[in-house]
């Protein structure tokens, strides 16, 4: 009888709890597998704290590493890491239901409601078809990316280049930023057009989100004339995501070009085209990808601060990227200017922004700053690194970016444990909690407390 009651309690877990529990279970299983001697390149078990850190950074698609991925882990260990990255990028529950579909098992109404919460959709109509598109689209994009990578990595690494290409394609699309080539990420390919272009495209596609994908494809499929009006046919969500993404890439690249132009440690000796490549890549990768073509510790303080801001913003909702999200920031800014202008409603692209969306945006931004601030305070208590390096590390962890100013590998036990927490919370907390709140029924109390004016600002 007690077992039946416990099973009912598990079934009655909210979507948020199931998401958080699924990621936690994946981390624990992944850390156990990585702690086995077979996962180590030397045949000796890696310390469990490093296995736990690697499992967390993989499933949370962060990319911060305490040990070199290419030299520490065996092929089996790298396969485990790649599986965790794919699992984290798509979402544990998404993959689980994808497997059920592959086994021809029917998804019940409860399963469809959960997928609605996971993808943050308005209804469950066509949810199974949407899931199928997500899974197939992911495999197609990653496969194309791997094939393009092979044109560079196979000539350079031989047959091993095939595995490197597959690993990098999945890691880039999932915005994980982990690679198995060298300690300095993609710094050796800073001037390689194919590697730069493919990596940036995979990062952007993964970061835009699946909703934007299918909305753009829908418009392109149905449009027959007046192509200049394609943008008008997109949903408000897609318009915001595409616009903010474009602005951040262009403005970010211009800022890095300006502030790194005379930096002797980075771009001073580069040609103009090389500076453009490096600046573009930095603007794209800081939006939660984690790959690097220039050493992050060599950036000027101004560029480091710009990188922190871009990391905080991150990608778009319902994608593989982390951060506060482009749409969240856009809604918050529009709402702020509406308040300043004494406007009753926040408007964007000729549409009013729902009050609920504004409230969610405030909640997401607030939670991110709380998590990042507490992590910064705690990490500064256990390490004597520079403040800019600590802030860079904690924001990178919270926004699941993976860029570091050479601090991750020097963390002690407490430092590693501190960084593990924001990586996990950044992946499941600010996102899934807001989704859960939006699906809960409001308490409509018959008696309401009186309202009283207060002074703010």
Where are these regions (language model features)?
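Membrane-proximal intracellular helices of multi-pass ion channels
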Residues: 1-457
């Amino acid at each position: 009888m007690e077992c039946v009651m416990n099973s009912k309690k598990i079934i009655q877990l909210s979507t948020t709890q199931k998401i958080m529990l699924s990621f936690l279970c994946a981390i624990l299983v992944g850390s156990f597998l990585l702690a086995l001697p077979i996962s180590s390149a030397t045949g000796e078990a890696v310390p469990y704290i490093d296995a736990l850190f690697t499992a967390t950074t993989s499933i949370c698609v962060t990319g911060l590493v305490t040990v070199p991925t290419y030299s520490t882990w065996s092929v089996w260990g790298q396969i485990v890491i790649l599986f965790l990255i794919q699992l984290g990028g798509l979402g544990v529950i998404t993959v689980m239901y994808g497997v059920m579909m592959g086994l021809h098992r029917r998804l019940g109404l409860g399963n469809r409601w959960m997928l609605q919460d996971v993808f943050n959709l308005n209804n469950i109509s066509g949810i199974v078809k949407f899931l199928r598109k997500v899974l197939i689209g992911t495999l197609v994009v990653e496969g194309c990316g791997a094939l393009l990578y092979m044109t560079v990595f196979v000539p350079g690494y031989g047959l091993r280049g095939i595995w490197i290409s597959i690993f990098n394609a999945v890691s880039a699309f999932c915005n994980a930023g982990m690679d198995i080539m060298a300690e300095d990420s993609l710094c050796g390919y800073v001037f390689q057009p194919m590697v730069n272009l493919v990596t940036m495209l995979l990062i952007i596609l993964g970061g835009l989100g699946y909703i934007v994908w299918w909305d753009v494809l829908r418009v392109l499929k149905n449009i027959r004339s007046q192509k200049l009006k394609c943008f008008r046919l997109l949903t408000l969500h897609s318009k915001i995501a595409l616009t903010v993404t474009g602005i951040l890439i262009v403005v970010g690249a211009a800022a890095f070009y300006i502030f790194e132009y005379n930096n002797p440690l980075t771009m001073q000796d580069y040609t103009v085209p090389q500076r453009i490549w490096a600046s573009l890549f930095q603007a794209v990768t800081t939006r939660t990808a984690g790959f690097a073509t220039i050493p992050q510790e060599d950036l000027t303080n101004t560029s480091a601060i710009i990188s922190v801001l871009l990391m905080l913003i991150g990608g778009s909702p319902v994608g593989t990227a982390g951060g506060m999200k482009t749409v969240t920031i856009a809604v918050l800014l529009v709402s702020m200017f509406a308040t300043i202008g004494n406007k009753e409603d926040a408007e964007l692209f000729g549409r009013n922004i729902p009050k609920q969306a504004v409230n969610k945006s405030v909640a997401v931004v607030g939670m991110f700053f709380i998590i990042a601030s507490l992590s910064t305070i705690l990490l500064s208590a256990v390490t004597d690194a520079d403040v800019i390096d600590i802030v860079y590390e904690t924001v990178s962890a919270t926004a699941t970016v993976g860029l570091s100013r050479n601090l991750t590998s020097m963390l002690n036990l407490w430092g590693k444990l501190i960084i593990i927490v924001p990586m996990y919370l950044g992946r499941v907390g600010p996102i899934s909690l807001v989704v859960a709140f939006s699906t809960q029924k409001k308490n409509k109390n018959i008696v309401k407390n009186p309202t009283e004016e207060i002074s703010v600002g």
